């Protein structure tokens, strides 16, 4: 860069001064790296979102909206139900669910009950599900009442791989008209769920209690139960 006069130099200095003033209001990178925060479990962040955004939509599933308050209530009820059927610290809960509101609810409910979430791909074969369940020590699994999934889960439950199977209703997750159409035209895709142990419906699980017992979780050491 070539300066032809003192005026050019003064102009550059003026620009640098303006830039420095503008940067004064920004947080230095070194300070950003030293920000302090209080570690909390993941479900506590959900509770904070519920308290802050209660009436706002949290999930839109095929046109059916769930607000934060509703999601919070569903998580609490499901967590309380999980505790009643034996979920506590160290207990593994498998989620063999597609992308539905049930996944969000049961994920946070498991953590809030003190359990550890183990994700299963619903497209896994029966053998793959069994191998993962045994490897992870999963005896409680959450699934959807679609034959595509339940045909595999049901066989494993019959062989004693799962001690509890929590069944979620696809129809109940859909908005009114779609639920009706699903029942009329897609009924053959639904599995027949035995009304006996080890099965329990999501609705029945959530009706056991409304609030879970508090569980002490250290988010710095209890990594699997964040």
Which residues make up each language-model segment?
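Structural core segment of the AMP-binding/adenylate-forming
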Residues: 2-12, 112-204
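A short N-terminal helical cap/helix-turn-helix that marks the beginning
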Residues: 5-18, 36-58, 73
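AMP-dependent adenylate-forming
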Residues: 20-28, 45-67, 223-224
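Flexible, low-complexity linker/hinge segments
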Residues: 31-40, 183-223
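Conserved AMP-binding/adenylate-forming core of the ANL superfamily
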Residues: 37-38, 47, 55-100, 104-108, ...
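Short, flexible hinge/linker loops that cap or flank conserved catalytic cores
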Residues: 51, 87, 217-221
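Surface-exposed loop/turn positions
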Residues: 57, 91, 115, 221-222
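ATP phosphate-binding P-loop of adenylate-forming
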Residues: 75, 221-226
């Amino acid at each position: 860069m070539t300066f032809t006069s003192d005026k050019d130099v003064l102009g550059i200095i003026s620009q640098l001064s303006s830039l420095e003033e503008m940067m004064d209001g920004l947080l230095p990178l070194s300070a950003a790296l030293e920000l302090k925060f209080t570690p909390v479990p993941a479900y506590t962040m959900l509770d904070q979102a519920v308290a802050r955004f209660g009436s706002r939509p949290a999930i839109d599933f095929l046109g059916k909206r769930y607000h934060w308050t509703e999601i919070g209530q569903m998580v609490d009820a499901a967590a309380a139900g999980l505790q009643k059927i034996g979920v506590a610290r160290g207990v593994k809960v498998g989620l063999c669910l597609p992308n539905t509101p049930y996944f969000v609810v049961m994920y946070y409910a498991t953590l809030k009950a003190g359990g550890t979430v183990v994700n299963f791909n619903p497209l896994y074969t029966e053998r793959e599900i069994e191998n993962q369940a045994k490897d992870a020590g999963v005896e409680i699994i959450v699934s959807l009442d679609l034959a595509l999934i339940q045909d595999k889960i049901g066989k494993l439950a019959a062989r004693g791989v799962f001690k509890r199977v929590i069944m979620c209703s696809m129809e109940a997750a859909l908005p009114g008209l779609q639920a009706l159409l699903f029942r009329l035209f897609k009924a053959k895709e639904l599995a027949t769920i035995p009304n006996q142990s080890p099965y329990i419906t999501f609705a029945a699980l959530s009706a056991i209690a409304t609030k879970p017992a508090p569980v002490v979780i250290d988010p710095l050491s209890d990594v699997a139960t964040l």
